[in-house]
Amino acid sequence: MTPKRLPSLLFLLLAALTIAALIGGCGAPAAEPPAAEPAEPAAPAAEPAEGEAAAPTSLDFVVWSYGLETIQDNINNFQAANPECQINLKDYSWLDYHDTMVGRFAAGDPPPLLYGSDHWLQEWASAGWLAPLNEPFPQVTDYSGELAPYALQGMTYNDDVYGLSYYADTIDFVYNEDQLKAAGFDAAPQSWQDLWDMSVALKEQGITEYPMILAFSQSEGASIEAMISMIYGRHTGEGALFDANNQPTFNSEGSAAYEAIEWLRQAYEAGLLDPASLSTAEIDQVKSMQSGAHTFTILPQYNMAELNKPDSGEFAGKFKIALMPGDSHATVGYVRFYAMSPKAAEMGDAALACSWKFLEYFGGKTDGTYTVVKRWAVENGLGFAQLPLFQDPDVQEAFGKWGDVDVIAAQAELARAKEGLTPWFGAWDVFTRAEIHKAILGQQSTMDTLANMEAEWNRLAAQ
């Protein structure tokens, strides 16, 4: 019967399907998915359009707050000649500059370009905060032979050159010629006794209540240079403060340092030194002299252009430079300079290249001329380390308007770098300012002041 045959038919049907499947499985393998077509090469980055410059390399430049309009104009001129470099100017008050920059260094935030000074160089260079210029730029030493020795010394640490001079100058003794003549004197003081006698006469005759003013504010960075100049003028040769091994030589009664501080103490007590000196900074010192309130002062020479500026007051043109009073007439010569931090190299080759172009443009020669240095000299009366500029007719004419060029040159020849320039000099300087104040005010003896100065020096040296 048909129903009895169904299992057989089902069996045959299933068998046929199984065989077909096996035959299919033994056939050619299924084709692999097609390999992806190679991607078209990416189009090359578009070249800058013809005449279109790449973005300039940006460098920060930090200065103290003097002549900012002139600085920015010099930057503009530099950028016009070097469009691949962009300089960003930032300034801090001179009174705060050292501490502000130390704070930035310590915080890991140094600018690649900045102002430096001889009395901070050893501190900053030994800490690695400044970069020696002669390593990436060996050509910097080509300028060394044209620099005043005291200036080159002030930019050198461990035989490496750390700067190109922004300006270099002497600390000068300045007097009001009209007032001195009114008191009956025809010549400037040659000794500190002369200065005392003239000051007494000026005070007694009512010409000036306080014949002398100094910028001895404890925040005035140039005060130590004025103090050392008073010491140098009394001392002949090296060793006025420190010997060749940076050991103190000043801590003895009768030393030039003792005599200088004693003179100030006695002048303060006698009413010859204005008490305001102990809180006066340089700008106010200049204004006070211009007003006729004082006859004598000691200050950086570049201030002479401002003192004798036409129409600046009754005594414009009447302020004269004299050699520093004392047996040797020596004074301090100092340098402020353009410096570079290690950050410039960290920023790469383009930053280094722009840094050198900037440094040479500002502190070196452009087309064979010290263009920027000469501008500061002619327009602002800034002194300079670049000796060939003394022969420049424009400089001679400009300096002759506010000073006796022969006296300026004579004092420059007698100028000496500060002794004791070490990594701890800056810290000792700040300590010393306060100690000298105590002596002037009679809060402690001059010998106690000198002893404290020596003890602090030795403590710092031992660290």
Regions found by a protein language model. Give the residues of each.
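Hinge/lid segment of periplasmic solute-binding proteins
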Residues: E47-G51, D118-D172, Q190, W196, ...
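Glycine-centered hinge/linker elements that transmit conformational signals in sensory
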Residues: S199-V200, N245-L278
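Extracytoplasmic "Venus flytrap"/periplasmic binding protein-like
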Residues: N76-L147, T156, Y162, D178-Q190, ...
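Extracytoplasmic/periplasmic solute-binding protein
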Residues: Y157-Y166, I171, W196-P248, R265, ...
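Extracytoplasmic/periplasmic substrate-recognition and gating elements
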Residues: A80-A81, A107, K181-A183, P248, ...
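Short, low-complexity disordered leader/linker segments with a strong preference
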Residues: M1-D60, A80, D448-A451, A455-Q463
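Long, aromatic- and glycine/proline-rich binding clefts that accommodate carbohydrate-like moieties
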Residues: F319-A322, V373-V430, K438
